[in-house]
């Protein structure tokens, strides 16, 4: 019976914990489970068993997003709702093919593209959305950081920066500004394989939009430049004031349907529910 099965599981866990310690046990939860199930799983492992050995694909597949956004914004969660697409004047899609991987969100993005919203796609592959995009930056694989540095360069040198937002809400901007100002666009053009004039147009479109909304996927995060790319995407949003409002922000497209929820609920060894740092007693 189920009652007998639960008794066996409980007895075995207690026996292992008593013999080898709580850290000899680990739990793996699922990003296809509900928020409630994920919360209970991490709570059981942390409270009943007494260890932080709880994990899932939320940390593995989108660790660069979580870490990069944590460094930039203090949280690794998406900043906006998919419904905010209705308010966006520009959409920036980087390293993702949501028509295939996230069909509901992909359909909403496609509808926005077809309605004429200014659209920028960065992808080595010519996807259906890339065909529809206003600007397709078809980079060489491995040049994610380079293409974003080019965009940042043009936003800075062409005076498209949101000075009020930077002065009010950011730190160390001048260091970043000095770095991107000194970049050689001819060299980066050769590296990325994308015309610097096309990059300049895309940068202007993103920076001058009233509300520009960014989405990125596993083409960014499952990559050796993942965290740096996410931090540069964050920098672009901050330097143009495209954060903290409806219709803007950074919005990772995760690998499974509830990766965001699993992370929110604390299914990761280094953070509890609500992204609480386990190393901080408060």
PLM feature segments, named:
Residues 1-282:
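Catalytic alpha/large subunits of respiratory electron-transfer oxidoreductases
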């Amino acid at each position: 019976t189920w009652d007998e099965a639960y008794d066996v599981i409980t007895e075995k866990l207690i026996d292992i914990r008593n013999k080898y310690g709580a850290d000899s046990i680990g739990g793996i939860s699922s990003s296809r489970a509900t928020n409630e199930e994920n919360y209970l799983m991490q709570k059981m492992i942390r409270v009943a068993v007494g260890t932080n050995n709880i994990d899932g694909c939320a940390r593995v597949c989108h660790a660069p997003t979580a870490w990069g956004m944590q460094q930039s914004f203090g949280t690794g969660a998406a900043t906006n709702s998919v419904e905010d697409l209705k308010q966006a004047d520009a959409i920036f899609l980087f390293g993702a093919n949501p028509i295939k991987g996230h069909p509901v969100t992909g359909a909403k993005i496609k509808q926005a593209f077809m309605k004429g919203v200014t659209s920028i796609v960065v992808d080595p592959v010519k996807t259906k959305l890339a065909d529809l995009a206003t600007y397709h930056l078809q980079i060489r694989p491995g040049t994610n950081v380079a293409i974003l540095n080019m965009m940042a360069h043009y936003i800075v040198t062409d005076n498209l920066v949101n000075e009020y937002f930077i002065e009010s809400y950011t730190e160390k901007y001048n260091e970043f500004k000095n770095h991107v100002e000194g970049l050689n666009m001819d060299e980066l053009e050769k590296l990325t394989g994308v015309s610097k004039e096309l990059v300049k147009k895309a940068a202007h479109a993103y920076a001058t939009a009233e509300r520009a909304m960014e989405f990125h996927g596993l083409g960014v995060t499952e990559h050796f430049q993942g965290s740096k790319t996410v931090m540069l995407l964050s920098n672009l949003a901050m330097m143009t004031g495209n954060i903290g409002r409806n219709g803007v922000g950074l919005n990772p497209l995760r690998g499974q349907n509830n990766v965001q929820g699993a992370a929110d609920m604390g299914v990761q060894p280094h953070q509890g529910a609500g992204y609480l740092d386990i190393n901080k007693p408060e």
